[in-house]
Amino acid sequence: MSNSASSFTGVSSGYTAGTPVPADSPIRDNIADAVRRVRETTPLAQSFTTFVTINLVANAQLAAGGTAAMSFLPDDVIETAKIAGANYINVGTLLPFYKDALPEIAQRLNYLDKPWVLDPVAAGIGRTRTAILQAFKAAPPTMIRANASEVIALANMWGLNTETVGDASEHRPAGVESVDDVESATGAAVALAQYLTEQHAKHSSHDASTRCAVAVSGIADLVTDGETVYRLPGGSAMMTKITGAGCSLGGVAATYLAVSDPLTAALSASLLYNRAGEVADTTSHGPGSFQVAFLDALWNVTAEQVAESEILVQ
């Protein structure tokens, strides 16, 4: 399965709930600094991602200013991880040997204290995918990037208190599409972020005060470190018309994770995507030209423009 564009809608909808983050907030300074650092240092982020969208993932990482490495063999992944600033695992398309290989890779990344982003594409569908995602609970990522249904499914799979309304069995992604809105995934996202932070505090040699993050893509994206919930209105409806928008966002999040803390990385990547989508909307005439314009916008949008984007505290 591929992570299709509709798992990252990013459509401007007039979402207004929440308190605006002040213009002089340190959060905005951190975001601008992350965007600049990526462009100045071109950090390497390794991706283990779906065959369907691998090209867009790599090109988006390059357009954002980073360096891309795409790996599939476990030994390649581990060796490359030693020199990469961060890593990205996407479970969109699977082969039988991944059932053992991916959990082993996750364990090695954590042993090496290498930050990594998980995109749990189509969480809850298929025994192999479910087994892999369940195994990740014991070797969790530093950040999760997903749509609302995937976040809810993963939190339920890990037995976390998600505060999900209704029968949890009803909250399943329709393939790689989200059948839940972002708001309904708030409890699951917070629970996941708290769990990731607790686990990494126990086992990582990094600063124990650093919190992990979860980014939920949708009409008004949600990003949380388990303590504060941010909403990010904006983007373009055309993002739903190109496959790989969500997958590539995960890759770019890993690029930012190579130079910043998880919350800053998640906010920076999501805001960059919203801004680039809005810019591409003004010059494109359909999905093909939008994708080209979008990559150009990832390259041209300034750090100041990203940091000045609308950010609301829920």
UniProtKB/Swiss-Prot annotation:
GO terms for biological process: thiamine biosynthetic process; thiamine diphosphate biosynthetic process. It catalyses: 5-(2-hydroxyethyl)-4-methylthiazole + ATP = 4-methyl-5-(2-phosphooxyethyl)-thiazole + ADP + H(+). Substrate binds at residues 70, 244. GO terms for molecular function: ATP binding; hydroxyethylthiazole kinase activity; magnesium ion binding. Its cofactor is Mg(2+). CDD domains: THZ_kinase. SUPFAM superfamilies: Ribokinase-like. Pfam families: HK. Its EC number is 2.7.1.50. ATP binds at residues 145, 217. Keywords: ATP-binding, Kinase, Magnesium, Metal-binding, Nucleotide-binding, Thiamine biosynthesis, Transferase. Transmembrane segments: none annotated. It comes from the Bacteria. Pathway: Cofactor biosynthesis; thiamine diphosphate biosynthesis; 4-methyl-5-(2-phosphoethyl)-thiazole from 5-(2-hydroxyethyl)-4-methylthiazole: step 1/1. Disulfide bonds: none annotated. Catalyzes the phosphorylation of the hydroxyl group of 4-methyl-5-beta-hydroxyethylthiazole (THZ). Belongs to the Thz kinase family. This is Hydroxyethylthiazole kinase. It comes from Bifidobacterium longum (strain DJO10A).
